[in-house]
C-alpha cells in the first residue's frame, strides 16, 4: 500500500511521463521517466570516470633555487613557462614549483613545503643511484628496502629534498 507522499510522487511521475510523450521531449541518454516518482534530472547514470594518467603535480617550496638544484642533481630538467613559472621535467611528467607565499591560483587549500611523499622510478640500478647520490652530497635516509610499486615489486632508497619532502627512488629491475 502506498503512503500519501508515494502516491503524490507516482502521480507526478505519471504526469511527467505523459507530458514527455505528448510533447516528445528527448531525454538524455540513459534517463527515463520513473514510476517511482524520480524525475530524470534526479537519476544519475552510474558511469565511471576514466583517468588516463598523471600530467603534473605541484610542490610548494621555501627556496626555489635550492629545490631546483636538488632535483636537477636527480636528473630532472628545469623549464620555464607562463609568466615566470618554473617546473621540473622528467620523462613525460612535470612538477610545477610554487614558492611558499607566492603560489599561483588556484592552489592547494594549505600549500605546505615538506608535506610530499613521492616515488620516482629510475632507469639505473639502486647501487648506481646510491653512488650518484653520495657523489652529489645527498644522504640516503633509508634503504635499500623492498616495496610494492604500481606494477609490481620494487627496490627503493629514500632521500629528503631541501624542504624535507620524502623522495623514494625505485627500481623494478633490482627487485627481481
From Swiss-Prot:
Q: In which pathway does it act?
A: Secondary metabolite biosynthesis
The annotated phenotype of a deletion mutant is: Does not affect the itaconic acid nor 2-hydroxyparaconate production.
Origin, by domain of life?
Eukaryota
User: What Pfam families does the database record attribute to this sequence?
Assistant: Glyoxalase
List the active site. Answer: 168
Q: Which residues form the VOC domain?
A: 53-172
Described by its record, this protein's role is as follows: Glyoxalase domain-containing protein; part of the gene cluster that mediates the biosynthesis of itaconic acid and 2-hydroxyparaconate. Cis-aconitate is secreted by the mitochondrial tricarboxylate transporter MTT1. In the cytosol cis-aconitate is converted into trans-aconitate via isomerization by the aconitate-delta-isomerase ADI1. Decarboxylation of trans-aconitate by the trans-aconitate decarboxylase TAD1 then leads then to the production of itaconic acid.
The similarity comment for this entry is: Belongs to the glyoxalase I family.
- Report the PANTHER family cross-referenced here: GLYOXALASE DOMAIN-CONTAINING PROTEIN 5 (PTHR21366:SF14), GLYOXALASE FAMILY PROTEIN (PTHR21366)
Mind telling me what this protein is named? Glyoxalase domain-containing protein RDO1
